[in-house]
Structure formats: structure tokens, C-alpha cells
């Protein structure tokens, strides 16, 4: 599993920076077959750099984003390129710097507000929800708030209950916010660039375990003009027997499960990468369900009021319901605060075997 690989590369320490420095010396590399590749970390970094060059109203603000190059080195080199007025270190006060960033957006700038982890965004949720998300509506469309809130989200590795929460259901329920959750380097680059250019607040939920993962990247995605539209999911693996839907690192779990289903049962699973939480691309999901007649959702949030619950409800309310041959199955985080113990933590987070079991239930395989 990705979450167990090269742990030293994903923690925000000076030691991890030494481990990483040799692998991110350039934006992308070419594999042995000539396919260009890029890490999610470099995709996010290049997206911010290009948008800061493109628009001098864009600036980055947050804890350790400047002199330390970011806790996870996402902002590596930006201070040297743009200076301390556009790459701004802050004290440890999420309420303070989020309020500053939101006010700057109201004044016409385009802040990128980084949370070291989205768990800390709880300290600033009033600014995000009551100020950034609602002011356009409450001002009768007069006062926009072009701001990006970004940082790592969801379970990581042995960081316990207060640092492992998944915020897609939280922010995905708020009118006035757009919420995206990238899986691949191409997702991260295209969605972040689109978020920075958007005239309204966008929440970008990243995953720290994916930061160091390398993905193939197309020539189109390397263009400075590349953006991905919100509300458009991607079929990562075509299939005909069952639909598996995930977002961010849950796509990894879904793809692993699809491989197991193929190898063990000859089942061809279609895997959908949501990319966008709000707006949600229910049309792509429904089209897949009409083909496969079965669906399993996978995410690392809690099942109650979660992403899978929303997908299940919308499928039930759509004409895709008539195509279902089995109830929707949800695979999600165990309904407990995240344990610190690694073995218990691993048992709390969805894995491929759990997804396979859910798929077998849908397919009536004993």
C-alpha cells in the first residue's frame, strides 16, 4: 500500500527534505518507455509558481510556507522567486492568517491560504464558511472572494485522531464553496490552477501520502494554460461488471481492489476518480451504474453523512436507480476517532480487501 512506502519522504521534517531533494530536482522526469512523469508535490508547486507568474495578485500565506519551503515542501523555491511580500510566513494562528487572507481576497487579491493540515482549518472555519463562502450571496453578487484554501486532508500515518480527519463532507456541504480532491499529479496541477483562477472560494483537499507519488503526465497537462474543470469525474479504469467510485487516495484503494477482483473472480470493475466533491459529477457515476448495474463507494471519511452517503442518495434519486441489481455499498472509515497505534489505525482505514468484500456482496459472490 502507498501509505506504508517510504515514510521518511512524506513527513515534514528537515530529514525528509534531504531524502526528497534528489528526487525533485526537476519538475518531471521520463520513465524508461519515454512517458513523462511528475510527483503530486511537483505538480502543486509548479501550478502555484505558474499562476503567481501569470497574475501578480496571487500570493501564498501560511505557516512555514516561506523560509522552510512548506511543511511538505510544496512551496519549495517560491520565496526565492517571488520574495516575502508574496510568500508569507505567519505565526501559528489559523484564525488570524485565514482572516487576513479572506480580507485580502475581498480587496481584490488572490490568496492561496495553506493549512499545514486541514485539521487546523477548524480554528478558522468561521472565516471559511461565514465570510468567504457566504459573502457573495449576502452582498447580492457584488462582493466576490477569490481565495484558495489548500493543504493535506484525511488520514496520514500515525498522527492520531486530531490530525487524521477527512473534511470533504464538512466543506462539501457548504453552498458557496467549491471543493476538489486530487488523486494524480495531473489532477493536482489542473485542479489547483483552476482553483487559483476561479473568482470564488475553492477548497483543495490534498493527501500527504500522495505528495511523493509519481504519476504519468500528459504533454497537455504540462502547458501553463492547463486547467481541469470542476464537477467532472474521470474514469481511471473501464469495466462492465461493477462501478467503484473513490476520491484522492481512495482511488488507489479502488484500483487495487479492481485488480484483485479481476485476478480472483474475473470481474471487470470500472473505477471512477471523483476529482470534484462540490460540484459532484453524478452524471458520470450514473452513466457507469447504468452499464454495470452495481456500485461501491470508497472514501476515508465517516459513512454517516459522508461522500458515499451523498452518492448513494443521488443515485437513488436519479434514473440510474432503476438499473441497480443490488443495493449501493459504502466503504469508509471505521466509526471511531482515528487510533494512534499503527496496526489499529490500519484496521480503521479502508483497504482493498474490504472493497473486494463489498463488491462480492453486490455481485452475490459467496
Curated annotation (Swiss-Prot):
The keyword Protein biosynthesis does not apply. Its cofactor is thiamine diphosphate. Pfam families: Transket_pyr, Transketolase_C. Its EC number is 1.2.4.1. It is found in: Mitochondrion matrix. Keywords: Metal-binding, Mitochondrion, Oxidoreductase, Potassium, Pyruvate, Thiamine pyrophosphate, Transit peptide. InterPro entries: PDHB_mito-type, THDP-binding, Transketo_C/PFOR_II, Transketolase-like_Pyr-bd, Transketolase_C. It comes from the Eukaryota. It catalyses: N(6)-[(R)-lipoyl]-L-lysyl-[protein] + pyruvate + H(+) = N(6)-[(R)-S(8)-acetyldihydrolipoyl]-L-lysyl-[protein] + CO2. One of its GO terms (biological process) is aerobic respiration. SMART domains: Transket_pyr. GO terms for cellular component: mitochondrial matrix; mitochondrion; pyruvate dehydrogenase complex. Tetramer of 2 alpha and 2 beta subunits. This is Pyruvate dehydrogenase E1 component subunit beta, mitochondrial. The gene is pdb1.
Amino acid at each position: 500500500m502507498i501509505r506504508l512506502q517510504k515514510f521518511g519522504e512524506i513527513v515534514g521534517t528537515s530529514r525528509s527534505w534531504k531524502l526528497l531533494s534528489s528526487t525533485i530536482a526537476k519538475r518531471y522526469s521520463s520513465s524508461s518507455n519515454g512517458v513523462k512523469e511528475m510527483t503530486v508535490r511537483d505538480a502543486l508547486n509548479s501550478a502555484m509558481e505558474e499562476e503567481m507568474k501569470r497574475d501578480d495578485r496571487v500570493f501564498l500565506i501560511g505557516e512555514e510556507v516561506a523560509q522552510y519551503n512548506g511543511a511538505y515542501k510544496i512551496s519549495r523555491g517560491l520565496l526565492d522567486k517571488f520574495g516575502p511580500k508574496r510568500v508569507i510566513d505567519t505565526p501559528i494562528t489559523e484564525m488570524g492568517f485565514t482572516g487576513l487572507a479572506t480580507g485580502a481576497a475581498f480587496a481584490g487579491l488572490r490568496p492561496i491560504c495553506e493549512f499545514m493540515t486541514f485539521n487546523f482549518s477548524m480554528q478558522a472555519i468561521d472565516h471559511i464558511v461565514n465570510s468567504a463562502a457566504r459573502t457573495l450571496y449576502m452582498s447580492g453578487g457584488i462582493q466576490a472572494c477569490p481565495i484558495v484554501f489548500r493543504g493535506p486532508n484525511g488520514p496520514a500515518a500515525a498522527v492520531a485522531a486530531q490530525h487524521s480527519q477527512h473534511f470533504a463532507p464538512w466543506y462539501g456541504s457548504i453552498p458557496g464553496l467549491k471543493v476538489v480532491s486530487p488523486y494524480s499529479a495531473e489532477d493536482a496541477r489542473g485542479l489547483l490552477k483552476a482553483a487559483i483562477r476561479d473568482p470564488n472560494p475553492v477548497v483543495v483537499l490534498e493527501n500527504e501520502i500522495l505528495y511523493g507519488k509519481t504519476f504519468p503526465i500528459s504533454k497537455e497537462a504540462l502547458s501553463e494554460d492547463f486547467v481541469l474543470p470542476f464537477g467532472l469525474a474521470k474514469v481511471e479504469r473501464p469495466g462492465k461488471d461493477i462501478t467503484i467510485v473513490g476520491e484522492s487516495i481512495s482511488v488507489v484503494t479502488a484500483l487495487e481492489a479492481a485488480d484483485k477482483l479481476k485476478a480472483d473472480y474475473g470481474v471487470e470493475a470500472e473505477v471512477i476518480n471523483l476529482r470534484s466533491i462540490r460540484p459532484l459529477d453524478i452524471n458520470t457515476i450514473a452513466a457507469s451504474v447504468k452499464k454495470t448495474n452495481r456500485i461501491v463507494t470508497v472514501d476515508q471519511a465517516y459513512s454517516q453523512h459522508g461522500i458515499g452517503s451523498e452518492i448513494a442518495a443521488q443515485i437513488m434519486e436519479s434514473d440510474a436507480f432503476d438499473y441497480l441489481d443490488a443495493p449501493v455499498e459504502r466503504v469508509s472509515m471505521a466509526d471511531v476517532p482515528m487510533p494512534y497505534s499503527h496496526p489499529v489505525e490500519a484496521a480503521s482505514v479502508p483497504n482493498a480487501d474490504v472493497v473486494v468484500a463489498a463488491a462480492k456482496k453486490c455481485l452475490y459472490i459467496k
